[in-house]
Regions:
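Short, electropositive alpha-helical surface patch
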Residues: 149-162
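Small-aliphatic-rich amphipathic alpha-helix that forms the alpha element of a beta-alpha
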Residues: 40, 97, 103-150
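Short, charged/polar surface micro-motifs in flexible loops or helix N-caps
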Residues: 60-64, 70-71, 103-105, 148, ...
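N-terminal amphipathic, basic helical "cap/leader" segment at the start of enzyme domains
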Residues: 1-92
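A structural motif
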Residues: 92-98
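Short intrinsically disordered coil segments
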Residues: 70-72, 113-114, 179-186
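C-terminal helix-cap and adjacent tail motif
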Residues: 2-7, 11-14, 19, 161-192
Length: 192
């Protein structure tokens, strides 16, 4: 028989991302962040390739990225509203962890599985932050797919991609619950 962990299950059944616009200082310091990164790095990783890495962004780096995302938006012809929304996430949030997908050459592990592992790291980091009492949100957005932004503002190599930006801070306001998937519409049972 399995040994249940009711507290963990209760957390997973009630977890809720916090909108980045509601996050405020303080964010976790290095001592508080390291266990969250450790938890995230325990993600499923077929072949133990570690096809991801972390960039911790805070303080002046957040303000620099707010300016960089605005410049990127202007270059891409984004609307003033889109630019303001993207900039706002970087200006308000006290800390962000960029999860970077770093594909590794492997004759056994397909690239897609490495992408899934990087996504799993994002979710694990998000859940670790929420379980530790922080407000957190997993964002990406148009700038995360722009090579000029990710290479120029974040220093990514040409073979690296952003899997997600995990913004972490103190929760400013509890968001209302949102509708959840109807399991009757998405679950198939096969017994033969």
């Amino acid at each position: 028989m399995p040994t249940p962990n009711p507290a963990a299950m209760d957390f997973l059944l009630s977890r809720r991302s916090r909108p980045a616009k509601t996050l405020k200082a303080p964010g976790p310091d290095k001592a508080a962040l390291m266990p969250l990164l450790t938890a995230a790095a325990r993600t499923p990783d077929h072949g133990k390739l570690e096809p991801w890495r972390f960039i911790v962004l805070r303080d002046a780096a957040m303000r620099r990225l707010a300016d960089a995302v605005a410049d990127c938006g202007t270059r891409l012809g984004k609307s003033d509203e889109d630019i303001a929304k993207a900039r706002d996430a970087w200006e308000r949030s006290p800390l962000c962890v960029a999860v970077v997908e770093v594909q590794k050459d492997s004759p056994k592990i397909p690239a897609l599985e490495q992408t899934y592992s990087a996504g799993a790291v994002c979710l694990a980091l998000l859940n670790a932050a929420l379980a530790s009492g922080w407000g957190a949100n997993w964002l990406s957005g148009w700038a995360s797919h722009d090579r000029g932004f990710v290479e120029g503002a974040l220093g990514l190599a040409s073979h690296e991609k952003i899997a997600g930006f995990i913004h972490i801070g103190t929760e400013g306001a509890t968001p209302p619950e949102r509708p959840r998937p109807d399991l009757d519409q998405i679950v198939s049972w096969v017994s033969e």
